[in-house]
Amino acid sequence: GWINKDLPKYNIKYATSADGYDWNRDGKVSIELEENETALARPCVIIENGIYKMYFSYKDPSIGYRIGYAESTDGLSWTRIKLNELGVSKVGWDSEMVEYGFVFKHNDVKFMLYNGNGYGMTGIGYAIER
């Protein structure tokens, strides 16, 4: 295998658009990478009770992808909150990694669709917030 391979690092940045087609990007980072992380991806933001809630994927090469969580009062400055992260199962199709969550509400119940091991090759599942 390769040793000390420099991998690209990806974070989540802020952009605005008046029409959803033309975007203004000023380079402002919304979520910073933590020490062992190499990538942040696929943010999904919902607003509940005036709080912006972001679910995003993060990659730590030692554990693979996980789904992280952050909150904001203005949609610009975000604070990561470890308590609300979705972890992996003990065994099965999502026991190695979970990623690319999409959160939505239906009949006042919050659901998350997400991919399992192998970026979803072993399955796609859902979680319900309790």
Regions found by a protein language model. Give the residues of each.
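Carbohydrate-active catalytic/glycan-binding domains of CAZyme proteins
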Residues: 1-130
